[in-house]
């Protein structure tokens, strides 16, 4: 095998690979063995005609397609390894020369991993990130717990007031016609919750059980449905029942009922501690992100478009998986958000480019600093993943994970170690 390498443009190379005629003939014979049974030649049983007869009857090129594939599968990986070429996508293969008794020559044009010029990555200055737990946040959490433990009872007499729960039947009309999704029976709505559009809920205040009313509202311009966006609508509403919520008192008894604590003060203290922990983790994550962004700003990379497109495709697949868990699909998502595949991909583009750039920088720093994942770290990471799967035999599952996902685990571990290095060497400023 002979290989010539030509730089076509930035991050794109063309390899001209020559396979000697003897090797190519072996590939043709391999192709013949694979396809022999499909050839039907007069005077021979199907699949029994010899190679020289097949070439004569069908022409020598009949076996070239698979022969080309066999040659490329064998020689292309060796060619890129020998020339230290790191492709980011599949190559474009073009045949230069092919024929009986000739060397097989082909070109492989491929986009390569770009050069990363690191700037300063140790000692970057990043603004300190910190959060304080406000008393109001603690009180809001207590109110939320109060709401979850409210007692609900029927309101035997009287009108709907804010804070009441109305059980209603409704049917909506736009342009005088009923629309899909605009009708429900025995629907519970808390007045003042903002569940419905516009002032729908406010217009129910003052109504009594069994009373009906026409409620007039307008859909928001960006409601998410082309047939409803910005349009006025009329709803025929009937009050079936009215319920009232009784909130429990915020006292020591409440704390005992909803938690492991004996006093309200102990419950408040626990809520505050949990919030402090959450905010501390949030501040840490934001600081780490700011450090990486500062390092990225100092680096120079010309990212090939194909890498960004591949990352966008990965992001779309992730979105599709998340939607599937919710019982939805991409088509429904596009309709609901008044979007399209093209719009969503364009929206993802900036994030995709940022991710690719960050990954390349982290890999380059790992290379410069000689940061690697040890076998022990791989095992520990796999054990963590195995525990998340809830498997009984954790060690066996971890072993399978290492074998199947070693490359992904290594990247995760190495990136984590690089991040620790960057944060440890950063300068926190006020």
From Swiss-Prot:
Keywords, ordered alphabetically: Cell cycle, Cell division, Chaperone, Cytoplasm, Isomerase, Rotamase
UniProt catalytic activity: [protein]-peptidylproline (omega=180) = [protein]-peptidylproline (omega=0)
Main localization category: cytoplasm
Name of this chain's protein: Trigger factor
Function: Involved in protein export. Acts as a chaperone by maintaining the newly synthesized protein in an open conformation. Functions as a peptidyl-prolyl cis-trans isomerase.
PANTHER family cross-referenced by the UniProt entry: TRIGGER FACTOR CHAPERONE AND PEPTIDYL-PROLYL CIS/TRANS ISOMERASE (PTHR30560), TRIGGER FACTOR-LIKE PROTEIN TIG, CHLOROPLASTIC (PTHR30560:SF3)
Pfam families from the UniProt entry: FKBP_C (PF00254), Trigger_C (PF05698), Trigger_N (PF05697)
Enzyme class, first EC level, given as a word: isomerase
Domain commentary: Consists of 3 domains; the N-terminus binds the ribosome, the middle domain has PPIase activity, while the C-terminus has intrinsic chaperone activity on its own.
Cellular compartments annotated: Cytoplasm
NCBIfam families documented for this protein: tig (TIGR00115)
E.C. number(s) listed in UniProt: 5.2.1.8
């Amino acid at each position: 095998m002979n290989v010539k390498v030509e730089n076509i443009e930035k991050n794109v190379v063309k390899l001209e690979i020559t396979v000697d005629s003897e090797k190519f003939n072996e590939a043709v014979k391999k192709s013949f063995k694979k396809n022999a049974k499909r050839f039907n030649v007069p005077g021979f049983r199907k699949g029994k005609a010899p190679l020289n007869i097949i070439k004569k009857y069908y022409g020598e090129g009949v076996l070239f397609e698979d022969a080309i594939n066999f040659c490329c599968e064998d020689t292309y990986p060796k060619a890129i390894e020998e020339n230290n070429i790191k492709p980011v996508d599949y190559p474009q293969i073009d045949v230069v020369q092919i024929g009986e008794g000739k060397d097989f020559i082909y070109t492989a044009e491929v986009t390569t991993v770009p050069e990363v010029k690191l700037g300063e990555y140790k000692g970057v200055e990043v603004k300190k990130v910190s959060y304080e737990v406000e008393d109001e946040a603690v009180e809001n959490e207590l109110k939320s717990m109060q709401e979850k433990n409210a007692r609900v009872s029927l309101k035997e007499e009287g009108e709907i007031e804010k804070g009441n729960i109305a059980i209603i039947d409704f049917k909506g009309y736009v342009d005088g016609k009923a629309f899909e999704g605009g009708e429900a029976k025995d629907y519970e709505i808390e007045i003042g919750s903002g569940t419905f559009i516009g002032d729908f809920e406010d217009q129910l205040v003052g109504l009594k059980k069994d009373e009906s009313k026409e409620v007039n509202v307008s859909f928001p311009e960006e409601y998410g449905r082309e047939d409803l966006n910005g349009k006025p609508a009329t709803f025929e509403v009937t009050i079936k029942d009215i319920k009232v919520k009784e909130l429990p008192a915020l006292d020591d008894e409440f704390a005992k009922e909803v938690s492991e604590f004996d006093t309200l003060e102990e419950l408040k203290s626990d809520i505050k501690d949990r919030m402090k922990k959450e905010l501390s983790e949030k501040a840490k994550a934001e600081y780490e992100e700011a450090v990486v962004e500062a390092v990225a700003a100092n680096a120079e990379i010309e990212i090939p478009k194909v890498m960004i497109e591949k990352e966008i495709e990965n992001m779309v697949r992730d979105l599709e998986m998340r939607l599937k868990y919710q019982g939805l699909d991409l088509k429904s998502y596009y309709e609901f958000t008044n979007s399209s595949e093209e719009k969503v991909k364009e929206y993802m583009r900036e994030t995709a480019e940022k991710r690719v750039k960050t990954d390349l920088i982290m890999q380059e720093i790992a290379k410069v600093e000689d940061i690697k994942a040890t076998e022990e770290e791989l095992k520990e990471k796999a054990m963590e993943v195995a525990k998340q799967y809830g498997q009984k035999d954790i060690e066996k599952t971890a072993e399978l994970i290492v074998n199947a996902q070693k490359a992904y685990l290594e990247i995760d571990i190495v990136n984590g170690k690089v991040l620790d290095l960057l944060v440890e060497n950063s300068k926190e400023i006020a």
